[in-house]
Swiss-Prot record:
Protein family according to the UniProt entry: Belongs to the bacterial CoaD family.
Residues binding ATP, per UniProt: T10, F11, H18, G89, V90, R91, E99, Y123, I124, H125, I126, S127, S128, T129
Site (Transition state stabilizer): H18
Coiled coil regions in record: none
Role summary: Reversibly transfers an adenylyl group from ATP to 4'-phosphopantetheine, yielding dephospho-CoA (dPCoA) and pyrophosphate.
Protein name per its UniProtKB record: Phosphopantetheine adenylyltransferase
Lineage of producing organism: Bacteria, Pseudomonadati, Aquificota, Aquificia, Aquificales
Pathway: Cofactor biosynthesis; coenzyme A biosynthesis; CoA from (R)-pantothenate: step 4/5
Organism of origin: Aquifex aeolicus (strain VF5)
Gene Ontology CC annotation, any one: cytoplasm
Signal sequence range: none
UniProt subunit comment: Homohexamer.
Length: 161
C-alpha cells in the first residue's frame, strides 16, 4: 500500500490555491484524500454536499485524488481511512502559527504528522474569504476559481450569466 495523505478543510468555496496544493501533493504522494469538513456550527455559504461536488469537479482529471466529507475529529476520520499524514497549505506567517498549534494537537491526540506546503506564488493571495467577497459583488473570479465553482458562486449571489 502506498502513502495516503489527507488534505482537510472547509473549502467554502474551494479555489485555485487549494487545487494547487492538491496537485502538488498528488505528485508527491500515492493518494490524496480531500476531506471536506461538514462543520454544522459554523456559518457556511455552501453546504457540505455542494462543497464536495465543487472539489470533485476541480480534481476529476487527477486519478489519485478522492474527495470525502467528514463530520468528526479529523484524527478520527484519519484513523478510519488508515491515514497518518496531513497536508496543509500555509500562505502567511499568521497561518503558520495557527496551523502549528493544530498540528501539535493532532500529533498529541493521535501521533499524526503534518506536512506544510506553501501555495505557488500566483495563488498565495487567494483565500476563500476573498473569493466570497469578490463573488458577493459579482466581480471577476476567473483567476481564483474553477469554472464550475464560479458558476455556483454567481448563482448564489444572483450575478446572472
Amino acid at each position: 500500500m502506498g502513502k495516503r495523505v489527507v488534505y482537510p478543510g472547509t473549502f467554502d468555496p474551494p479555489h485555485y490555491g487549494h487545487l494547487d496544493i492538491v496537485k502538488r501533493s498528488a505528485r508527491i504522494f500515492d493518494e490524496v484524500v480531500v476531506a471536506v469538513a461538514k462543520k454544522p456550527r459554523k456559518f457556511l455559504l455552501f453546504d457540505a454536499e455542494e462543497r464536495v461536488k465543487m472539489f470533485e469537479k476541480m480534481v476529476e482529471d487527477i486519478p489519485n485524488v478522492e474527495v470525502k466529507m467528514f463530520d468528526c475529529l479529523l484524527v478520527d476520520f484519519m484513523k478510519r481511512e488508515g491515514i497518518n499524514v496531513i497536508v496543509r497549505g500555509v500562505r502567511l506567517f499568521t497561518d503558520f502559527e495557527y496551523e502549528l498549534q493544530i498540528a501539535l494537537t493532532n500529533y498529541k491526540l493521535a501521533g499524526v504528522e503534518t506536512v506544510f506546503m506553501m501555495p505557488s506564488q500566483e495563488y498565495i493571495h487567494i483565500s476563500s474569504t476573498i473569493v466570497r467577497d469578490v463573488a458577493s459583488y459579482c466581480g471577476d473570479l476567473d483567476n481564483m476559481v474553477h469554472p464550475y465553482v464560479k458558476q455556483k458562486l454567481r448563482e448564489k449571489f444572483n450575478c446572472g450569466s
